[in-house]
């Protein structure tokens, strides 16, 4: 039996086939790499394209210098995101999306790309939430990719004011994607 590659996660049922490294985009927008780390994402053939489109639309919509920067989006499973959530946030439970903004050096080394950070999205939680809320999976995935991206460019929702600003940005970006307001009929939660 061969050893799994470092960083490779088995599929959501415990199998260990090769993971897929999705394609990247490059333009005035950030260079985005989507890594499909858990094979349960294979059930959603359009996941990579959905994430890339959401990130590109968000980058076009926000007032942030993202051109030439890089970010990675890891499509993972509940077990791995639970571990990340426990390690980085002290919450030992799965969540839908985590963002890890990159620390910016005072001086960028010549030729080195500027890193925006990383986003992790958990398949089972996203699927469960989409089903529970009666939303198309790709709409919910787009929302979470946008949410994660906004964290990378400085948005947050720690206060009511921040939450309102972030949700307004999400609504505007999702509207550009033809996705209905994900907060319609909900009480604001920061």
Swiss-Prot record:
Protein's cellular compartments: Cytoplasm
Cofactor: record remark: Binds 1 zinc ion.
Swiss-Prot/TrEMBL keywords: Cytoplasm, Endonuclease, Hydrolase, Metal-binding, Nuclease, Ribosome biogenesis, rRNA processing, Zinc
GO cellular component terms, semicolon-separated: cytoplasm
SUPFAM superfamilies for this protein: Metalloproteases ('zincins'), catalytic domain (SSF55486)
Highest taxon above the source species: Bacteria
Cofactor(s), by name: Zn(2+)
Gene Ontology MF, one: zinc ion binding
EC class of the enzyme, as a word: hydrolase
Gene Ontology terms: biological process: rRNA processing
Residue positions binding Zn(2+): 147, 151, 157
A Pfam match: YbeY
Annotated region described as Disordered, given as residue ranges: 1-25
The enzyme's E.C. designation: 3.1.-.-
Oxidoreductase as UniProt keyword: no
PROSITE patterns in the cross-refs: UPF0054
NCBIfam families assigned to the protein according to its UniProt record, in alphabetical order: rRNA maturation RNase YbeY
Function summary: Single strand-specific metallo-endoribonuclease involved in late-stage 70S ribosome quality control and in maturation of the 3' terminus of the 16S rRNA.
Family as reported in the entry's similarity comment: Belongs to the endoribonuclease YbeY family.
Name recorded for this polypeptide: Endoribonuclease YbeY
Species in which this protein is naturally found: Rhodopseudomonas palustris (strain ATCC BAA-98 / CGA009)
Organism taxonomic ancestry: Bacteria, Pseudomonadati, Pseudomonadota, Alphaproteobacteria, Hyphomicrobiales
């Amino acid at each position: 039996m061969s050893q799994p590659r470092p960083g490779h996660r088995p599929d959501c049922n415990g199998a260990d086939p090769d993971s897929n490294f999705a394609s990247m985009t490059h333009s005035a927008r950030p260079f985005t790499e989507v890594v499909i780390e858990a094979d349960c994402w294979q059930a959603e053939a359009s996941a990579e394209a959905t994430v890339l489109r959401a990130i590109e639309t968000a980058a076009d919509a926000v007032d942030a210098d993202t051109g030439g920067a890089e970010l990675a989006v890891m499509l993972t499973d509940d077990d791995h995101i639970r571990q990340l959530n426990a390690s980085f946030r002290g919450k030992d439970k799965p969540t839908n999306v985590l963002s890890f903004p990159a620390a910016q050096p005072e001086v960028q080394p010549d030729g080195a790309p500027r890193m925006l950070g990383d986003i992790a999205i958990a398949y089972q939680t996203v699927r469960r939430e989409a089903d529970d809320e009666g939303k198309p999976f790709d709409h919910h995935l787009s929302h979470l990719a946008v949410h994660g991206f906004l964290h990378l460019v400085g948005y947050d929702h720690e206060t009511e004011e921040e939450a309102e600003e972030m949700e307004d940005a999400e609504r505007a970006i999702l509207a550009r994607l033809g996705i209905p307001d994900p907060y319609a009929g909900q009480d604001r939660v920061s």
